[in-house]
Every structure is written in C-alpha cells, then in structure tokens.
Amino acid sequence: MKRIGVLTSGGDSPGMNAAIRAVVRKAIYHGVEVYGIYHGYAGLIAGNIKKLEVGDVGDIIHRGGTILYTARCPEFKTEEGQKKGIEQLKKHGIEGLVVIGGDGSYQGAKKLTEHGFPCVGVPGTIDNDIPGTDFTIGFDTALNTVIDAIDKIRDTATSHERTYVVEVMGRHAGDIALWSGLAGGAETILIPEADYDMDDIIARLKRGHERGKKHSIIIVAEGVGSGVDFGRQIQEATGFETRVTVLGHVQRGGSPTAFDRVLASRLGARAVELLLEGKGGRCVGIQNNQIVDHDIAEALAKTHTVDQRMYTLSKELSI
C-alpha cells in the first residue's frame, strides 16, 4: 500500500487533530503517502482531497476540533453516494482509508469495506459510546470541561443556597453524566441507561435539606430529558430555588487533555499499521490500556453499555 486517506466525520471531538497527526506521520515514516479528505464523507463525494505532508500536521496536537473539518452526509448512506466516494478514492490512487469519528462514521467505513475498499475506524466522539473500546478520543477532555463547570457552579450554588440542574451531552449514552457526576460529587445523576423515580429524587433532596444541606447538584444527560423541565419540576415540588445550566457544545471544544492526545496518537498509529498489514474492515480501541482491534461489523452489532458498578457507586456515595 503506497497511498492512504484520512477523514474525520460526524461530531467533532478534542484529540481528532492528534489522531490525524499520528496517521500522517506514521504513514510517512513507512514511506506511504497520505491524503486528507476535507469535510468528511461529503468532501469525499465532492473530491475535496489534498495530499498531506509532515509540516501540515505540525503544531496541531494541542488543538481542539479537526483541521480536516467535519460534516454530516446523508448522501453517503445511499449506494450511489458510496460509489461516488469510491470513485474519488480510486481517482486519487488511495488504497486504504482511516475514518475518525463515531458510530455513524463507522457505518460509512463498514459500507466502503463491503464494497471492497479497506477502511479502519478510529473512535472519535465525546460520548464514549463506541463498542470495542474503553475510551473514545475526546471523552476525557469533555469530562474535564464538565467537571470544571460543575466546580464553578457548586461555588455559586453554595453562596446562594440553590439547587442546580446541569444538563450534559449524551443522547443515548450516559458516560459523560455518570463520570462527571461521580467526580463532581453530584447528589443525583440521571442517565439514559437507567430508570429513575422523580418522587424518590424529590424525597432525597428534601431529606438532605432537613439535615442542613442547603445546595445540591443534579446532572442530567440530554437523552433523559430537558434539564429545564427537571429544574421546573424540582422547584415546584420542593420550593427550593433552582437554576438550570445547559452546557451544550462547549463540551466538544478545547485543547485535548494529555490522556486524549496520547490515546489519539496510539490509535491513529495502529490504524495505519492495520492498513499496511492488509487488514481492512477493522476498528481500533483501547481495553485495559492495551491497543486492540476488532471487526468493524461485529463492533457495530454490539451495544455500548455504561459501567453499572460506577452507577451503583454514584448512588451509594450520594446519600
């Protein structure tokens, strides 16, 4: 294999640039040319493709976002869109592709593989919801962003003796809510993977208030429901002054943590190795601090599950 491509797709996550850097430098080290595909699968279909040199990925390891940009591309879900993408890859002499993104990006890589084009998926999403890996690129950075916000919110919650509801990202996966809530000492954590009893939440808040606790932090994953609605229900049921903070897209930005930079570097380099070994249709991940790879179709057939032990611990510690 003499020429490979790399693209980022779907929602951006801190550390994607570090992964791009690793792909480019690892490939060039082995005498392989690398072409960057801009704006994800949409850019692939449009032929927005450019050769990348070592200098093109200099001074990006610390930057959030993605220098290749990213976009959603409904057209690539169609057979016609996939064939257009393969035509562009062949036109540029690209023999293998590294796809950095979430489950939707993996679906695109799987389709290309089914058409006979070798692809390797690299997990890049703040949601940490990709099967086959303990952590995804960007999760740790997003987690630290949320923790920083929780710490600041707790300061003002304490000063004003208020209850705060903090809504975080996670439509289908509660990892951000669970990990940040546990690390931030939240009184209640609501995640999509677990049922909750609003009456029980209200009762626990009242019990805490009766024993002298004048402020509380509640973390709500967006997939559970609107933080604004939860805040309204809590204030109406308890009479406690309640405020709501929706963190939103700030969770996707910022300079990646050291953990995410190292993880992205390891995963990006391994993705190149797999292509050079002639192994397409794979996705890389980290499990027990070891870099692993799986069949991408098998990984997509599985469902990410939140760590129930951590969820149980969070409830035990929030009495």
Curated annotation (Swiss-Prot):
Q: What does this protein do?
A: Catalyzes the phosphorylation of D-fructose 6-phosphate to fructose 1,6-bisphosphate by ATP, the first committing step of glycolysis.
UniProt keywords (A-Z) are: Allosteric enzyme, ATP-binding, Cytoplasm, Glycolysis, Kinase, Magnesium, Metal-binding, Nucleotide-binding, Transferase
NCBIfam families found in the cross-reference section: PFKA_ATP, PRK03202.1
Transmembrane segments in this chain: where?
none
Q: Where in the cell is it found?
A: Cytoplasm
Q: What is its main location?
A: cytoplasm
Q: Which InterPro entries match?
A: ATP_PFK, ATP_PFK_prok-type, PFKA_ATP_prok, Phosphofructokinase_CS, Phosphofructokinase_dom, PKF_sf
Catalytic site positions: 127 (proton acceptor)
Pathway membership: Carbohydrate degradation; glycolysis; D-glyceraldehyde 3-phosphate and glycerone phosphate from D-glucose: step 3/4
Q: What is its EC number?
A: 2.7.1.11
Tell me the cofactors it needs: Mg(2+)
Biological source species: Geobacillus kaustophilus (strain HTA426)
State the oligomer form and interacting partners: Homotetramer.
Q: Which GO terms describe its cellular component?
A: 6-phosphofructokinase complex
> How is this protein's activity kept under control?
Allosterically activated by ADP and other diphosphonucleosides, and allosterically inhibited by phosphoenolpyruvate.
Catalytic activity, per the record?
Answer: beta-D-fructose 6-phosphate + ATP = beta-D-fructose 1,6-bisphosphate + ADP + H(+)
Q: According to its UniProt record, what is one Pfam family this protein matches?
A: PFK
Family assignment?
Answer: Belongs to the phosphofructokinase type A (PFKA) family. ATP-dependent PFK group I subfamily. Prokaryotic clade 'B1' sub-subfamily.
Residues that bind ADP: 21-25, 154, 185-187, 211, 213-215
Name the residues that bind substrate.
Answer: 125-127, 162, 169-171, 222, 243, 249-252
Residue positions annotated to bind ATP are 11, 72-73, 102-105
Name it: ATP-dependent 6-phosphofructokinase
